[in-house]
Amino acid sequence: HSERGEIVPTRAILKTAEQIEKIKESARLNTAVLDEVAKHIRIGMSTAEIDDIVYTFTKEHGGIPAPLNYQGFPKSVCTSLNNEICHGIPDKNIILQDGDIINVDVSTILNGYFSDASRMFKLGTVSERAEKIVRVTEECVNLGLAAAKPWGHLGDIAHAINTHARENGYSVVEEIGGHGIGLEFHEDPFV
């Protein structure tokens, strides 16, 4: 279909039942890593300490932190603080403060299968502006999930998210989005 300008995935995006179960196992560990971060994250800690938690917990449970050394990325997790959109690099000199919001983006390889998720944390007393962006972002995620239907269009997901973001005074960074998971870190489809 290249003559019509359609984009054909470079590899099969459909998974077998066995592959889906392996992806779910990886995702369960990925969620457990985020839960471990939630137990320890606090005002006064560095983002490098978050990286240490992610690395140690992942390795202790048989996984591999997918970001570590991926295309030169130097850490095991992405920590995006306040206005940083994504893929922030943990650093011992970045100390969490009262009022910060931080997105912790964890990606795990378990038995050769990749999973990827992030969680937003609010530290101490955050501003009304920060509360709003966290709330609207969560609403956007939920609307996107509600728009995801078997044999539906990916554009419906993007439309639901983009519409709600714009209605609340925000925009969506078009160069960054969701992606498939499984046998590779970033698989089709790109959402």
Residue ranges of each PLM-predicted region?
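Active-site neighborhoods and metal-handling regions in enzymes and metal-associated proteins
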Residues: 1-191
